[in-house]
Amino acid sequence: MPSSWKESGLRWYWVVVLVFVADQLSKQWVLANFDLRESINLLPFFNFTYVRNYGAAFSFLNDAGGWQRWLFTLVAVGFSTLLTVWLRKQPKGLWRLNLAYTLVIGGALGNLIDRLQHGFVVDFLDFYWKTSHFPAFNIADSAICVGAGLIILDSFISERKPNGEDVAKG
């Protein structure tokens, strides 16, 4: 374990702040400028559309009656805490995992604030093809997905030396 936070993955916590601020500013802009379900077409496959998500990814448990708000709050706090502990234990040089963890934490905290403040998550990025729409999402969701993808990628392409340095597999 690194001897100080400066030598640990916590040095990457600026990514958490960046994701969180970008996510919250974008959602505040949507709330200030859009009515619920209002949509503005930007490209032939992309709209800004304000929707409320009471569930999780892809509106999972969206209509569950309200208890899911507290479940997802606990999950966000739990994962953010766990990933922060892991960041403290790993060297700052493990850039892929440190970036992944901080993206997930920033996204989780962005959506957590929505749940606590509004009781729902503000989603607005709406991609579609003809009449088929992908579920709307936000910057926090994107950060969580990219972070999860990096964690999976890292598990396939990296091995660690005893000092924590990455070594390519194969």
Curated annotation (Swiss-Prot):
<feature type="active site">
    <location>
        <position position="141"/>
    </location>
</feature>
<dbReference type="InterPro" id="IPR001872">
    <property type="entry name" value="Peptidase_A8"/>
</dbReference>
<protein>
    <recommendedName>
        <fullName>Lipoprotein signal peptidase</fullName>
        <ecNumber>3.4.23.36</ecNumber>
    </recommendedName>
</protein>
<dbReference type="Pfam" id="PF01252">
    <property type="entry name" value="Peptidase_A8"/>
</dbReference>
<dbReference type="GO" id="GO:0006508">
    <property type="term" value="P:proteolysis"/>
</dbReference>
<feature type="transmembrane region" description="Helical">
    <location>
        <begin position="12"/>
        <end position="32"/>
    </location>
</feature>
<keyword id="KW-0997">Cell inner membrane</keyword>
<keyword id="KW-0812">Transmembrane</keyword>
<keyword id="KW-0064">Aspartyl protease</keyword>
<comment type="similarity">
    <text>Belongs to the peptidase A8 family.</text>
</comment>
<dbReference type="GO" id="GO:0005886">
    <property type="term" value="C:plasma membrane"/>
</dbReference>
<keyword id="KW-0472">Membrane</keyword>
<keyword id="KW-0378">Hydrolase</keyword>
<comment type="function">
    <text>This protein specifically catalyzes the removal of signal peptides from prolipoproteins.</text>
</comment>
<feature type="active site">
    <location>
        <position position="123"/>
    </location>
</feature>
<feature type="transmembrane region" description="Helical">
    <location>
        <begin position="67"/>
        <end position="87"/>
    </location>
</feature>
<feature type="transmembrane region" description="Helical">
    <location>
        <begin position="93"/>
        <end position="113"/>
    </location>
</feature>
<comment type="pathway">
    <text>Protein modification; lipoprotein biosynthesis (signal peptide cleavage).</text>
</comment>
<keyword id="KW-0645">Protease</keyword>
<feature type="transmembrane region" description="Helical">
    <location>
        <begin position="133"/>
        <end position="153"/>
    </location>
</feature>
<keyword id="KW-1133">Transmembrane helix</keyword>
<dbReference type="GO" id="GO:0004190">
    <property type="term" value="F:aspartic-type endopeptidase activity"/>
</dbReference>
<keyword id="KW-1003">Cell membrane</keyword>
